[in-house]
Structures are given as C-alpha cells and as structure tokens.
Amino acid sequence: AMAAPKSHFGAARAVPDGGSLTVIATALVETESRMDDVIFEEFKGTGNAELRLVRELADRRIYPAVDVAASGTRREELLATPEVVSARQELRRRLVGLPASQGMETLLGLLRRSKSNAELLKPA
C-alpha cells in the first residue's frame, strides 16, 4: 500500500539542463492514531529536509511556529560553504537545548538584530 506513494516521493530530483522537481508533503503526527504513526515512520526517511511545526508556538502566535532544533536538512554541506555550514551548526547548537518557544524567540531576536544572514552567522 505504501509503494506507490513512496515512488512519488522518490521522484524528486535535479533535472538535466537545469531546474528540479521538488515534492512537498505533510504529515500529521501525535494524533493518537496508530495508523498515522505507521505512515509517518514509513515515509520519515524519504525526505531531504524536515520542518517540524509546534502547536504551542502557533497557540502563542509565535511565527514561524517551527521547532528549530527538530528541523533541518540532510547533506547540508552540499548547500553552502564549509564556513557557513559551521556557523549554522553553531547557531543550532545554541538553540538545541532550549524549549521550542524559547528557541524560536531567541532566533527571532537574533534575526531582528541582524541586517543579513552573513551578519547573523558571524562569530560572536
């Protein structure tokens, strides 16, 4: 039953001569439905990136309602220079130990005080 949907997710790739095919999917978790959990676990490893949303943040009107520590991309080293990757990882380490709401509020504060991504990621 999962073979057809998994083949669709596997279709995401770079297209010769430029461009790419991007597949975006959502999964509702923590529903207390065993079937939802099974489906989520089946597809979890097929993505290249995961953006984990947090209901608590949305309820508090903190946007984007993203759990920074639980969100990320695989193979980040292919997307930026080693220096940028290192700076991103350092920022993530600073946020990882915080509750999701405090982590996002901290990140939003840093973003407000920065004029650019380069400034945000500059070593302290």
Residue spans for each PLM region:
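P-loop NTPase catalytic core
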Residues: 1-124
